[in-house]
Amino acid sequence: MSRPGPKPAASSRPRRGAAASHTQEHVNEKNIGSSSKPAEKKGSDEVTASSAATGTSPRMSTTGAKAVKIESEKSQSSEPPVIHEKKPKGKPKEGSEPQTLPKHASDTGSKHAHKEKALSRSNEQIVSEKSSESKTKFQDAPSADGESVAGGVTVATASDKVVVKKKEKKSLTPTLPMESTLNKLSDKSGVNAALDDLIDTLGECEDTNKDDPPYTGPVVLDPMDSTYLEALGIKEGTIPPEYRKLLEKNEAITGPLPDSPKPMGIDHAIDALSSDFTCSSPTGKQTEKEKSTGESSKAQSAGVTRSAVPPQEKKRKVEEEVMNDQALQALSDSLGTRQPDPQSHLRQAKQVKEAKAKEERQEKCGEDEDTVPAEYRLKPAKDKDGKPLLPEPEETSKCLSESELIGELSADFVQPTYQEKPSMPAAKIKKGVVPDDAVETLARSLGTRKEDPEDEKSLVDKVKEKAKEEDHEKLGEKEETIPPDYRLEIVKDKDGKPLLPKEAEEQLPPLSDDFLLDALSQDFSSPANILSLGFEDAKLSAAVSETVSQVPAPSNHTAAPPPGTERRDKELDDALDELSDSLGQRQPDPDENKPLDDKVKEKIKAEHSEKLGERDDTIPPEYRHLLDNDGKDKPEKPLTKNTEKLGQDQDPIDALSEDLDSCPPTTETSQNTTKEKGKKTSSSKASKNEEKTKDSSKKTEEVPKPKVDEDAT
């Protein structure tokens, strides 16, 4: 409280020198023979803490605090100054400065006598030297800051009474801050307090009058403390050239410094927020109040306010705010004044209106017929002769009268009053004339179809327009172009004569429409009518079997239809008649008459391989005795085989139809189909076994014909 702390403007050179000398002396004293007892360490720590507490006092920003600092510095300057001489690096002087202890140190020693008993004489000398050095530091600090002391004297004139009272009480300065700092340190370090209690139980240390032997070893030096590094910018020679230009620019600026924004209080913040809710008062009264408040504030600023000393926490906050303001001002000074924006005058200039562009109309390609290229012009459609086709006129629908419209709309609800003309019945189609399609009978009621000119052109003509026709001889069209491997070989006999092809079977006569309708509608009619049907020839029955081969016979014959269903039967008959007319006559397929042997011979070669037993030379001697018996030991062949061999010379349908006259026609058709299949298979085997067939034919001539053949003739 009584002594001010060091100012921030003081240079750091004397402090570093004092710190270096202090560390050098402390090392020498330890090497000479300082005791290492815990009681002595305790006393030294307490004295250093007290000296540090008195040396570091917080700064104050109010006028009263400045006056107290200045008066305290004056009282210190009135005391005789202590001259510090540079100590040699050799042995330090013992007991040279025991009398230079400050008054507050002696007062603290009297109050804490029970703690100082544990200190030794050698430890007292170390404490006295440290206290004297701390005193010299405090005396050097105000001497370096003489300008600040001189500036603060003018402020202290307003508080003379306070300064006089403090001069009288200078000799009796209280030691309360020291005690508070010691108590805080003792509270913070609970481990040290526990160690103090243990040390007190040991008792007082015995006084030893014997001096420790002097230290004769080498001098211990700390190279890091002895080196001095100059900070960049302390001297003018260390300032870089780039930063010198900034300093020169700042010196040339003579404008007023910007006012730092003042912190707003709670009342000002409430007034600013509540300004939107309060009603606005008249302007005349407000200006008068502002003038009166301005004059009163000026009058009050002339006098100096006297207030109590703020606590330490508030002092720290005020000092931090002052330092922040000073740092911001220093930064703002380095920036300089704001230069005017070169583009600001352009905004204020008048905008020049440009002349509107002239609109010119340009003709686009394709708007007129002249601008359309010849390649993209529409070509009119032409006939085969090259004449342009005229568009066909659209047929306009005839307007219906009101009565006709009402009749068409009310047809679903009521019988229309307007009756159309009775339509003429369509002419009956003759049975000889057959239409092209059954759908055309329905299309006649829709009207005539318009002919499209494009329909007349065939697809072949369209292809000829784009591609040229070139005749290429295909492989195999002529016998010369067929390769020898793929040429058909003529089938020859054993003698080398070519075999003549078999005569084609007799073609079936074309069937009449009535016969086909009767054959198709036999399932719909009664079974009595089925029995009445008679076939003239056996060949006709085979033709019917080809058309209706897979129709199954009805298992349950229906009874005679009731009389009410006669009309429906007639309608069905008429529909069947129309369908049968659309079918037309059946044309025979030329591929059906070809035997299967021809198809096979086209792909593979017919090679005759001699089989064992065909000649006498090839018969083994073991089986020759069978031929000598002339077939006496052979069993008789069944009649079924003979009947199958007879089918080659005689029509099988004629041979088998006599046994099946009593059966219904459906069974006959199924049996005929099976016989035809057997006929085809037998014909395929006939080419391979030609010699056997000749022998079998000779044997069949000798065998008498059965009774079935006699009945057929």
Curated annotation (Swiss-Prot):
Ranges of biased composition (kind: Basic and acidic residues): 351-365, 376-387, 448-505, 588-648, 687-713
Single GO cellular component term: membrane
Residues where Phosphothreonine is found: T173
Residues where N6-acetyllysine is found: K86
Pfam families: Calpain_inhib
InterPro entries associated with the record: Calpastatin (IPR026998), Prot_inh_calpain (IPR001259)
Biological processes per GO annotation: animal organ regeneration; egg activation; liver development; myoblast differentiation; myoblast fusion; negative regulation of type B pancreatic cell apoptotic process; protein catabolic process; regulation of protein catabolic process
PTM-bearing positions, type Phosphoserine: S57, S122, S171, S260, S281, S401, S403, S410, S445, S521, S532, S580, S582
Inhibitory domain repeat placement: 208-260, 341-393, 451-504, 588-641
Biased composition (Polar residues): 47-64, 120-129, 275-285, 294-304, 326-346, 544-558
Crosslink (Glycyl lysine isopeptide (Lys-Gly) (interchain with G-Cter in SUMO2)) position: K69
Domain of life: Eukaryota
Function field: Specific inhibition of calpain (calcium-dependent cysteine protease). Plays a key role in postmortem tenderization of meat and have been proposed to be involved in muscle protein degradation in living tissue.
Domain notes: Each of the four flexible inhibitory domains can inhibit one calcium-bound calpain molecule by occupying both sides of the active site.
Family listed: Belongs to the protease inhibitor I27 (calpastatin) family.
Protein name, per record: Calpastatin
Lineage: Eukaryota, Metazoa, Chordata, Craniata, Vertebrata
Chain's gene name: Cast
